[in-house]
Regions:
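Venus flytrap/periplasmic-binding-protein-like
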Residues: 68-82, 186, 190-214
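Extracytoplasmic "Venus flytrap"
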Residues: 1-13, 24-33, 182-185
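An alpha-beta-alpha
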Residues: 9, 96-144, 241-249
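Short, well-structured alpha-helical segments in soluble
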Residues: 32-49, 57-60, 162-173
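Pocket-lining segment of extracytoplasmic ligand-binding domains
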Residues: 130-199, 205
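Hydrophobic alpha-helical segments within soluble ligand-binding/sensing domains
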Residues: 78-119, 219-240
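Short beta->alpha junction loops
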Residues: 23-34, 38, 152-159
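Periplasmic-binding protein-like
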Residues: 42-55, 71-73, 121-124, 172-184, ...
Length: 249
């Protein structure tokens, strides 16, 4: 998903500004600590714009500079990611971007529509990801309103994904996985437990679903990145002020 968003971003800029943009693509390889090092390098170089792909990259960029325009993508909830109590759709300052938030109530509806006999739903996610926690809380509320029992099963990183997934499989009739980068990197381990146990998973995005789920209500991450690239074009051309640009979906 993240690679698709990056490619969409690059394609949008290359189409609008052919031969005029130089890209410096640095991958943190799933390590949040690497994000700070990478972003500090960008700031030292005086880049014209930073595209921050996923929450860890966005928070690192926001901490590193208040001057260079920052466009986030693959961010679920900007208010949660940036700890903004009064978020109203526009971050302000030097930050804007796009959100990958799908309709969580519709995802909850999928669980009850596909599995009407399900009584217990395990909510499987990474506790270190604020956006994952946000999605879990929203889906839990939706399911509670339908009379469905839920329980949270949180792993801290890739090291305990398998053990936590096993606990979730032992508990649940259905597992729900939100948009979560750690889960996305460990779909094989998750599938190796859920499939033999006969426990289906409804997922928050297509990449996770293709690895370990049965259904999802998702977005195109390529299109999301492309939209982010279109926003970048407006900023680089001086057509838009990032401080007034609302988050796009």
């Amino acid at each position: 998903a993240l690679d698709a968003a990056t490619q969409g971003f690059i394609d949008a800029l290359n189409e609008a500004l052919p031969g005029q943009v130089t890209f410096e693509n640095k991958n943190a390889s799933g390590e949040a600590n690497n994000c700070g090092t990478i972003v500090n390098g960008f700031v030292s170089e005086g880049v014209d714009l930073i595209m921050a792909n996923a929450t860890a990259a966005l928070t690192a960029a926001a901490s590193a500079t208040a001057d260079i325009p920052i466009l986030g993508t693959s961010i679920t909830a900007y208010g949660v990611a940036l700890d903004l109590d009064d978020f109203d759709g526009t971050v302000g300052g030097n930050i804007s971007g796009t959100s990958d938030l799908a309709d969580l109530s519709q995802q909850a509806d999928m669980i009850t529509e596909w599995f009407p006999e399900a009584k217990k739903v395990a909510l499987l996610f990474c506790s270190a990801k604020p956006n994952s926690s946000y999605q879990i809380q929203e889906v839990a509320t939706c399911l509670a309103n339908k009379g469905i029992e839920t329980k949270e099963f949180a792993f801290t990183d890739s090291n305990d994904v398998a053990s936590v997934t096993q606990s979730a499989a032992d508990y649940a009739d259905v597992v729900y996985l939100p948009t979560d980068n750690i889960a996305a990197s460990n779909t094989e381990a998750i599938a190796n437990i859920l499939v033999p146990a006969g426990v289906p998973a409804i997922c928050g995005e297509e990449g996770i679903c293709s690895g370990c789920g049965v259904a999802t209500l998702s977005i195109s991450y390529y299109d999301l990145g492309y939209t982010t690239g279109e926003m970048a074009v407006k900023i680089l051309n001086g057509e838009s002020d990032i401080s007034t640009m609302p988050i796009e979906y």
